[in-house]
Amino acid sequence: MTMPFKGVSADDRRTDRRNRLVVAAFEIAGTEGAGALGVGRVCLAAGLTKRYFYESFASLAELQSAVVDHAIAAMSERVDPYRPTGPGGPPQAWLEAFVGALVDDECLARVLLAETHGGALSPFRHQIIDVAIAGMAPPGSDPQADLRARLGAYAQIGTLTELCLAWHRGQLAMERATLVDVLADLFVRIDGARSAAPGTSSC
């Protein structure tokens, strides 16, 4: 049995080391791009030796997946309190929280939008689409079974990616509140167009 060190159990120490690696990797991906992730680079940023990397991750791909999970968890913490619980139109409060999180946090925007769109994290793009679908879906529905919901989510995330990243690069001269309003309105319009469209076959 492994004895606690300074009152901290071995399991807690392992969890802490893993969290440090994930946070360090998230910050690197969010500032330099996911292509800058490497075992040595991440361990140096986390203040750990390489052997502790392999204690938590079998490969760099596993770490990349954990970075996306970390980013989605950070997003969920912002938006889940605004998830609608009853029927109605598009959830405006959820939309504003979702868009606002990406406008306020450039690292989060880069990881979830830029790096999953043609970047090193592109294999995880579908997870971002799933978040958008779930947030816009009426309570009790099965959005994953609705092809039009997925098509609409791709259009919404594509629009959000271009405008949000352009704003972070200083290419859009508008206030933060205006950008959030514009993006939320575009989400609603795309959702309305999807809902009004004729039935779409999944074949």
Where are the language model's segments positioned?
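C-terminal peripheral helix-coil segments that are non-catalytic and often amphipathic
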Residues: 1-5, 134, 138, 166-203
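Short, amphipathic alpha-helix enriched in basic
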Residues: 8, 14-41
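Short hydrophobic clusters on alpha-helical segments that form packing/core surfaces
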Residues: 17, 21-29, 71, 75, ...
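Helix-turn-helix
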Residues: 28-62, 66
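Short, basic, alpha-helical segments at the C-terminal edge of helix-turn-helix-like DNA-binding modules
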Residues: 39, 67-76
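Hydrophobic alpha-helical connector segments
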Residues: 77-106
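Amphipathic alpha-helical segments used for helix-helix packing
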Residues: 99-123, 137, 165
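Amphipathic alpha-helical packing segments from all-alpha helical-bundle domains
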Residues: 118-162, 177-181, 185-188
